[in-house]
Amino acid sequence: MQFTALLAALGAPLALAASIPAAAHNHSMIDVQLAATGNSMIKATITNTGDRTLNLLKFNTIMDEHPTRKVMVYQDGAEVQFTGMLPRYKMSDLTPEYFVNLGPKASVEHSFDLAATHDLSRGGKIVVKAHGMVPTAEENATTITGHTLYESNELTMDVDGKQAAAVEQAMGGDDSTGVIDKRSNIVTSSCRGSQLRVLQTALSNASRLSRAAASAAQRNPSKMREYFKTADSRTVQKVASRFLSVARESSSGSTGRTTYYCNDNRGGCHPGVLAYTLPSKNQVFNCPSYYQLPALNNRCHGQDQATTTLHELTHNPAVVTPFCEDLGYGYQRVSALPASKAIQNADTYSLFANGM
């Protein structure tokens, strides 16, 4: 995967990001066009449609360089299984390499192979589209101050299944084996030093926070409207049920449905990643930076081990169905999501639990 910077009008190089008021970030300031460049290859062209420079954070967007969920893929009206990773990124201490500077009317291209993160072995016609929210920072800065939305064109492709099946899966490989702990199926042989104790504490705290959040969802309609944008009975029931499912998984005695690793063995712990999930396998992996987080954060909406574990468990279809995605990060982005997306956003659940 690679970024290819395109020249802006008059051939000027990409400028540094300009200051953009956060209030102006609720609409789309970028255009995303998808094009097929091979059997399962996609080229995404991202264009700044405005008259000011944008500083775009790549995490969990169409520009993410890692095997994350960049697009939705459908075949015969059903979603094609995603086999890539769903990471939780550390949102503090961001550095410039996590951003793309995009001048007015300038574009960048990002290419990726769908077959590396989707099972396309069946072959045939597929439909691909992308949508999301890109966090933005101000000029010469790395503090997130706003966001912009995007929605791509709908692309139809005819895939050769045999050719797609020959593409190496980005997060593939045989399932690891090891000694399993009874709680949430922790692979204890993956833990070093105090990591097992830290993870067990995080799971215990995640269970406690999830039960409290389930109760708050049922008793505090104003908080439901703040985070999930509605307090109707159906949404309340669904949110509470999901929190209780996370609580059960976090405290399971011997029936855990996820497999949790203290350390990464699939190469997904890229810079900035706290932990990640493989939803196709119901597996969660902690990264070294996870152990630098506090067990619990007293700062409202601050990241910690407990809510990171809670966040990752919502990515697992064995716990939450359909599993939650990464549609918005941080309180400002979460609070901008409509109800239909808030309920499917992993960070909405972790922030709600942290804020109770």
From Swiss-Prot:
Lineage per the UniProt record: Eukaryota, Fungi, Dikarya, Ascomycota, Pezizomycotina
Family per record: Belongs to the peptidase M35 family.
EC number, as in UniProt: 3.4.24.39
GO BP field: proteolysis
InterPro entries in the cross-refs: Fungal_M35_metalloproteases, MetalloPept_cat_dom_sf, Peptidase_M35
Co-factor remark: Binds 1 zinc ion per subunit.
Signal peptide positions (record): 1-17
Protein name stated in the entry: Probable neutral protease 2 homolog ARB_04769
Disulfide topology: 191-262, 269-287
Glycosylation (residues): 205
Localisation per UniProt entry: Secreted
Origin species: Arthroderma benhamiae (strain ATCC MYA-4681 / CBS 112371)
Ligand binding (Zn(2+)): 311, 315, 326
Enzyme class, spelled out: hydrolase
Keyword field contains Protease: yes
Catalytic activity, as annotated: Preferential cleavage of bonds with hydrophobic residues in P1'. Also 3-Asn-|-Gln-4 and 8-Gly-|-Ser-9 bonds in insulin B chain
Keywords: Cleavage on pair of basic residues, Disulfide bond, Glycoprotein, Hydrolase, Metal-binding, Metalloprotease, Protease, Secreted, Signal, Virulence, Zinc, Zymogen
Cofactor (UniProt): Zn(2+)
Family annotation (SUPFAM superfamilies): Metalloproteases ('zincins'), catalytic domain (SSF55486)
